[in-house]
């Protein structure tokens, strides 16, 4: 049995039934993403070495990287996606989820240190996003997007250096990157971030709860 799934990052995801079990293979042949996928696998391995309350991380079995392709072999988890979970969950199950995510983020904060981060780090990131949005044909004539970008531009241009916790984070902690297995929640698709801070995870999960960011 082999099932091919389209990944949100542009990676190919294959679910393959082998002699010793079912495994997930995540791969890319995109030269810009080869090293990133390998780094993300390492990040997932490190997170998987920690014991969290109700939070689990699929095991990474193998990472193969060549000049033309990166392939990551990992544990397959029988689970529900977030839509199936919330359709069937009662208040108790939702409370378990909230508690588990809270514990996970608090652990990250505890492993991080307050550091002064230069405003230029965020300004460079915003500049990169600004250029990508400008070049996106879907947004060229969208006045609302233009107004938002200009307001953001003003905010970032006046930004000062700030003290934030720097250390570890998932990088893309959204509901679409959580697999639901009973009262265990498997985090997938760890992302190497432009800055490793738990604030990334807080913002991402709030982005989901406030603006329904996740899509299947």
Language model features by range: what are they?
Residues 1-5:
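Conserved N-terminal boundary motif of the eukaryotic protein kinase catalytic domain
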Residues 49-65:
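Conserved HxN/HPN-centered segment at the entrance to the catalytic loop
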Residues 66, 71-91, 132-138:
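A glycine-centered beta->alpha junction motif in the catalytic cores
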């Amino acid at each position: 049995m082999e099932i091919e799934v389209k990944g949100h990052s542009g990676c190919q995801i294959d679910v393959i039934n082998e002699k010793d079990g079912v495994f997930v293979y995540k791969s890319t042949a995109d030269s810009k993403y080869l090293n990133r996928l390998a780094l993300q696998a390492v990040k997932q391995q490190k997170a998987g070495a920690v014991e969290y309350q109700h939070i689990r991380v699929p095991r990474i079995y193998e990472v193969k990287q060549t000049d033309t392709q990166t392939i990551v072999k990992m544990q397959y988890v029988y689970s529900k996606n977030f839509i199936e979970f919330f359709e069937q969950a009662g208040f108790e199950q939702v409370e378990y989820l909230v508690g588990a995510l809270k514990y996970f983020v608090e652990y990250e904060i505890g492993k991080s240190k307050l550091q002064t981060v230069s405003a230029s780090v965020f300004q460079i990131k915003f500049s990169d996003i600004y250029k990508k949005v400008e070049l996106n044909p879907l947004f060229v004539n969208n006045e609302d997007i233009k107004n938002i970008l200009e307001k953001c531009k003003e905010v970032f241009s006046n930004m000062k250096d700030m003290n934030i916790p720097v250390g570890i984070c998932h990088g893309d902690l959204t509901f679409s990157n959580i697999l639901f297995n009973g009262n265990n929640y498997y985090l997938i698709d760890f992302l190497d971030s432009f800055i490793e801070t738990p604030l990334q995870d807080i913002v991402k999960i709030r982005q989901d709860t406030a603006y329904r960011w996740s899509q299947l």
